[in-house]
Amino acid sequence: MPADGYVGALDIGTSSVRALLFDTGAGQVPDVEVHLPYQPRVAADGTYETDAGRLFRLVGSAVDALLQEAGPRRRSRIRAMGVSTFWHGLVGADAGGKALTPLYLWADTRSWRESDELRRTLDPDAVHQRTGCLLHPTYWPAKLLWLKRGEPVLWRRRPRWLSFWDLVHQHLFGRAVTGVSMASGTGLLDLADCGWDGELLRLLEVGEEQLPELGESGQGLARQFAVRWPDLRNVPWVCAAGDGALANLGSNCVDPTQRALTVGTSGALRVLYRGMPKRVPEGLWCYRLDRDRVVVGGALSNGGNLYAWLTRTLAVELPRLEARLRRYRPVSTGLTFVPLLAGERSPGFASHATGSIAGLTQATTAADIVRAGLEATAIEFARVDQRLDQVLPGARRLVANGAGLLASPAWMQIMADAIGRPVAESKAREASSRGAAIFAAEHLGVLDGDKLRTEVGRTYRTAAAAHAAYRLQTARQEELYRLLIHDRALDAGDAILNVRPATGETK
């Protein structure tokens, strides 16, 4: 352990809160690890939310457990706290930090009509290039317009609009402060000047005073928490950064030569680097890690959640599934799967999208459907990878993270074959947590994340014949997408959905 002590890391996800301890060289302390699960509320109308107060109490319990597991000697040497959390969460709060609404998570799609209206009212490409975000239910503009319409009494109170960590920061330090990373995931931040976007605020009739203050860290815990956590009383808590950006930092994918492939509940493929893209590629997004580094990529709404749905719904025997999946030749199930059960983000951002399977027969087995679903998800990642090449060509490999993906050699090989690049296993199994620790250590000035080595395990190479088969299957999958989603939207007179057809052109 370096003499400099330790860094605590919180990882607040949409299904659990984790707390880990790292030394200031980003090495994980193996006997200190807290995992507290929770379940968001999900409903068929697009609801995807949780209770902010309950989640805050869970975060407090995670810190309690972290300090207990660390023990007196180690917890007294914690020099900073780093935080990774989900982008795009939105909660309304009063001046004292009391939540007035549920915490709306990224997958809540109830504002799809408002996102469509914003695309009619605004110049979608101009907004995309300014903010790095698309006009879609994922982001705050659509959710705020939806709340303005649906909650007029609340709206007239002019509440504060915060991400979850901004609310936590207010409770811990007395002020709602957000970092540019979390702000960049709202869809309201101008990426170039790192300030709130005036055009969007005027349209939504939201004042800057209703948004969190932009800052970097908090220090000096409020009395209640200073008594509860005396070892952290004067320790700096670095403002939370987006889990995706920190996953890149934590797996040492910090330049355009390496792309981070993450499959959690959802999925993402990202590039982290210093600078700004000349143009954000169509169908992708650009957020910030800090004022110097951006992360460009695409997020899939369907990743580990799709795999979980398949295995649960089809009642597959998991111990035998992996061996069966490995026996398939690429694209041999006879199925074409549009894997959009949780809607679509990148690259089409069709807020109304649903999943479909074509080619089912009486001979189709449960394993066939699972294999087709994994192949279809890999094809979606390949589509994102191709768009990244438009602005950041030359990636030599992908570094993969996510427990479900890393546990399945069959899925890893499918990824390598479909995307057409080597895919290496990341040895940083808790990449976002490690990224939070690195980010905090950078804040202390004791570590440079750019200089850390990428630790990888097995690398899966692309088989040329398999890649050719996936290229053909990509065309079939895009055609089914066009027929079922893009053309259906146009037939309904809803051309403003901004869905991309197979050619990648906007109609």
At which residue positions do the language-model features occur?
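Conserved phosphate-binding loops in N-terminal lobes of ATP-dependent enzymes
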Residues: 18, 62-80, 144-145, 159-169
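N-terminal phosphate-binding loop and adjacent alpha-helix
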Residues: 33-75
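Glycine/Thr-rich phosphate-binding loops that ligate phosphate moieties of nucleotide
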Residues: 1-33, 79-121, 153, 271-282, ...
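Phosphate/pyrophosphate-binding loops at sites that engage ATP/ADP/AMP, CoA/4′-phosphopantetheine
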Residues: 59-79, 150-155, 198-208, 384-396
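Gly/Ser/Thr-rich active-site cleft segment
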Residues: 12-14, 127-244, 307, 342, ...
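ATP-dependent carbohydrate kinase catalytic cores
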Residues: 187-291, 319, 323, 406-410, ...
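A polyampholytic, Gly/Pro-enriched intrinsically disordered region
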Residues: 55, 120-136, 231-236, 258-260, ...
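Active-site nucleophile and cofactor-binding loops and adjacent substrate-binding regions
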Residues: 50, 80-85, 104-107, 131-139, ...
